Amino acid sequence: MTILGDDAPRTVEAVGKLIPFSGMAYHSRWSGREVNAMIHTGERVPLENHTIQTAPGDVIYWREWERDADDVSEAIAVYYGAELTRFHRGEQFVNVFGRVSQEHWDLLREIGERIWRQGGERLEILWNASQEQAP
């Protein structure tokens, strides 16, 4: 995975503080081909490098942007297909802070479809936010 530290420095910093991360990953109900895990950064991460149109391999951070509070819902996710990001209240911005290289998209699709059909799976992230590349 390529970390987009120049494009989303506050996001990379906030998410990087949670690593190593272990939690359950689930398939999205609203944004299509997306696998996500709920997190809690304890920070008010700003919109940066944000979009509502994701591409395969995009690694994103989402929060309830409209709530100016510390106890909002937050998630990290990876997309295995192009999608419009949305929530039950409509389109939602996400911060793109990483990209999985195209050579791994088939594996992403396989994992995403398996989670979609069979349910959540344990997710472990061992990436070091100070590195430009993550395994």
PLM feature spans:
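Second-shell loop/turn segments in exported
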Residues: M1-T2
